[in-house]
Structures are given as C-alpha cells and as structure tokens.
Amino acid sequence: MAFDDLRSFLQALDDHGQLLKISEEVNAEPDLAAAANATGRIGDGAPALWFDNIRGFTDARVAMNTIGSWQNHAISLGLPPNTPVKKQIDEFIRRWDNFPIAPERRANPAWAQNTVDGDEINLFDILPLFRLNDGDGGFYLDKACVVSRDPLDPDNFGKQNVGIYRMEVKGKRKLGLQPVPMHDIALHLHKAEERGEDLPIAITLGNDPIITLMGATPLKYDQSEYEMAGALRESPYPIATAPLTGFDVPWGSEVILEGVIESRKREIEGPFGEFTGHYSGGRNMTVVRIDKVSYRTRPIFESLYLGMPWTEIDYLMGPATCVPLYQQLKAEFPEVQAVNAMYTHGLLAIISTKKRYGGFARAVGLRAMTTPHGLGYVKMVIMVDEDVDPFNLPQVMWALSSKVNPAGDLVQLPNMSVLELDPGSSPAGITDKLIIDATTPVAPDNRGHYSQPVVDLPETKAWAEKLTAMLAARK
C-alpha cells in the first residue's frame, strides 16, 4: 500500500495496533519528547504516538515515533509488520532497481487550504513548537523535508534536492538551518552565494513516510528523490507546485513554508541534541526568511526525537543508508555481498565481500569512504568475508576475534573529511578514518595460518526450518 500523506500512514499504523493515542493532558515539555524517548527504551515493536491534549495549545495534534520500530518501518513500505529487518532491506534493494519512476503532478493539495504571507506570518501561532532535549538552544523543525534547486541548472529535475536538515525556529518568520557541507543543499547554497543571490527553498512538514525516508537517503547529486520515492512505493509519487517558489513539493504534506536562505548571512544556531547521541554546540549557521506559509486546516505536526541510539532516527536512516551504499559499491565491485551501515547514520559500516586478490577488501573499504555518503560519514569500516553476514553481529565479532592481526589489518587514514557533528573529530569536520580488515588473506597475502573454516553441516538448514516450525506449532 502506498501512502499519499501522513494521515493515511497514521491510520495504517492504528489498524496494525502500532499507534498509541495519549488522551490524558500532557505538557509540551518535557512530556512529548520524553514519551518519544521512552519508545526507544521499551524494546521491540515500539508504537507511534499521537497527542491531541497538550496543555497551553489549542487544537494541536502531534505525532511522534511514526517510523520508530522495525514494525513501523515495515508498514511504511507496505510490508507486513513482522517482516524481518534483513528482508526489509532486501525489499528496499529490489525496489531500488525500479528507479526512476516519474512522479504524478496533482492539483488541489490539502495544504493550500490556508495561506499567510510576509509580515503576517507567525510560526509560533501555526506550529505547536517544543524542545526535544533539555539542552537544546530552542525549538527545532527536525523532520521536515527541504526542497532546493541548483541555481545554475534550475530546470534539471534530478538536481532538485529533497533533504532533511535541522532548523531552529528563531523568530516569527526566521529559521536557522544547518547545511552540512557534504549535502546537496550546501552545494546549491554555495553556487547561489557565489552569484550574490539568496537560495529559494520550500520546507515541507508532516510528510508521508516514503518521502521522509528519501530525505534521509544519500542519493547521487542528479538522482531525484521523487523518482526514487516512486520506485520505493512502486507507484508514481504525488507532487504539487508550491505557489511562491514554483518548486515541486509533496502533494500530501500538512504544511509548506516557502522563503530563502539569505546570502552570506550567518547567525549562531544551536546547541541541539543530535543523532550522534551528543549535543552539537552553537555554531554560525545560515538564516532562512519565510515569506509564505500554506497549511491544512488543523495540521498534524510531526517531530523526531534524537538522542543516544536507538531512537526513531536510527530506524529512519538505517536501511536508507545501507541500500545506496550497497548499490554504489556493488556497481563497481560485483564481489560485494552486503552492507550494514545502520549504526549512527553509517559512521561505522560493515561490508562483506568476496576477494579477487590480496588487499582487495581494503580497496572496497577505501571506496566506501569516498562514496557521496562516505565522504561525510563513513569513519570506520569493518571488512568481512562473503560467508559472514554483516547484519549478524555474533558472526562479525567472530571475524574480528579470529581474523584480525593488529600488526597488519588496521589501515589508518589521517586527516580525512567527516561531518562536523562527529563529536570525535578534531578540528570539527576532520578525523582519521580506519579500515579493519577481518577477511581471510588470499594470495599474494600469505599472512597468518588459516586452516579451512568450520561451516554448518549440510543438514543444518533443514533442521533449523524443522525446529522453527515445531516451536511455532507449540504457541
């Protein structure tokens, strides 16, 4: 099932028993964020949360943790809630091959029901804003998709970017936005500022789950998130035209903010509790001026709790990081078998591969660090043999324990790029990177004395299936 908006997704979650509606009156702070934080601490099957009785707000409706469990992630893809994680990733890979699917342009989006312009805009009246962590420097929009275009090639649909970037609400119509240098919006901004121009943007809030997943997926610069969203949902993705910028935005969004990133203007933004589980400090960041707001009557506001993993962002970004990294590596190295980059947005990646010759696994690890995502994120790579499942951590630990000799299997690369939010980088944005080669050496590499590995007996698979069926029959 393809969801055209957030509301139909919430209904599906409710139908599957994966939406908890909190009827009691709650405080915006700390209850909303604390409840979302708690979903990551109660184990498997954490539900989405719905709040509509929030002290101090009139008619506020807030959804949290909508993709914050593997069950919810499966539902977002139209899969049964009990679909195993590896099968969800395999399905993501299968659908990826459908790219591109052209979007469907629709008229009469619900977000056009109400509009506010210019100095009449007051985001504090329109949005039920609250802090997510007690050390945050202000209110944040952290699950919105930001649409921007290449100023030098504005009609190139593929170069129109849809990405998720945190934004601090700093005034009635002013935001602070962090454009990470490795992301497409930073390239768009750089081109605009070289010309002395503001960068027009459209910000979409309360989105369907597929475009949210796409906003967190590191595609190539000229790959369209809308065309990939169509591939992932297996039907054309619905878009509409934003009235001020003329940009393509999701047809089903709850709220559309349009304005500009003001050229060469910077102000202190932050701190903010980040996906790394640490606060990013206050830094000079770009300033956004909002010139037009369009919104549904009684819009649903959605926010994303971030903190020490796992939280919703880890479910959101995990498969969305594994799959493009796998596809980009597989295109150049067919020997690559699987990529697990689910941990902290791929700051650590585990890659299994066959080997053509000695040193081959390290070459794959190096390439992972220079993919579009790897330049800013992949800080450590663990390379394992093709018979090791990178999603099976006991197998990975076995490979590390039995195959790694620190004398020759650690490859340290000094002074490499990483996103500034990496708390271990020094200075911010610069780090050493590490490849751990936990593969069995092959010629001409003759280090170690590896005998033939012990493998499962031929009958093991059949017995595993038989025992699983017997256990299921007892329940």
From Swiss-Prot:
**InterPro entries in UniProt:** BsdC, PAD_UbiD-like, UbiD, UbiD-like_C, UbiD-like_N, UbiD_Rift_dom
List the GO terms this entry assigns under cellular component, sorted alphabetically.
cytosol
Q: Has the keyword Manganese been applied to this entry?
A: yes
**Residues annotated as catalytic:** E274
Q: How is the cofactor bound?
A: Binds 1 prenylated FMN per subunit.
What the record says about family reads:
Belongs to the UbiD family. YclC subfamily.
Q: What is this protein called?
A: Phenolic acid decarboxylase
Pfam families recorded for this chain?
UbiD, UbiD_C, UbiD_N
The residues that the entry says bind prenylated FMN are: N161, V162, G163, I164, Y165, R166, M182, H183
| Single GO BP term | response to toxic substance
In short, the EC number is 4.1.1.61, 4.1.1.-
Task: Please describe what this protein does.
Answer: Involved in the non-oxidative decarboxylation and detoxification of phenolic derivatives under both aerobic and anaerobic conditions. Phenolic acid decarboxylase that catalyzes the reversible decarboxylation of 4-hydroxybenzoate and vanillate.
Lineage: superkingdom: Bacteria
Q: Which keywords has UniProt assigned to this entry?
A: Aromatic hydrocarbons catabolism, Decarboxylase, Detoxification, Flavoprotein, FMN, Lyase, Manganese, Metal-binding
Question: Which reaction is recorded as catalysed by this protein?
Answer: 4-hydroxybenzoate + H(+) = phenol + CO2; vanillate + H(+) = guaiacol + CO2
Any idea which GO molecular function terms this record carries?
A: 3-octaprenyl-4-hydroxybenzoate carboxy-lyase activity; 4-hydroxybenzoate decarboxylase activity; metal ion binding
Q: What else is known?
A: It is not known, if phenolic acid decarboxylase forms a complex composed of EdcB, EdcC and EdcD. The term subunit is often used in reference to the operon, however there is no experimental evidence to prove the existence of the complex.
Q: What class of enzyme is it?
A: lyase
* Binding-site list for Mn(2+): N161, H183, E225
* Cofactor(s) demanded: prenylated FMN; Mn(2+)
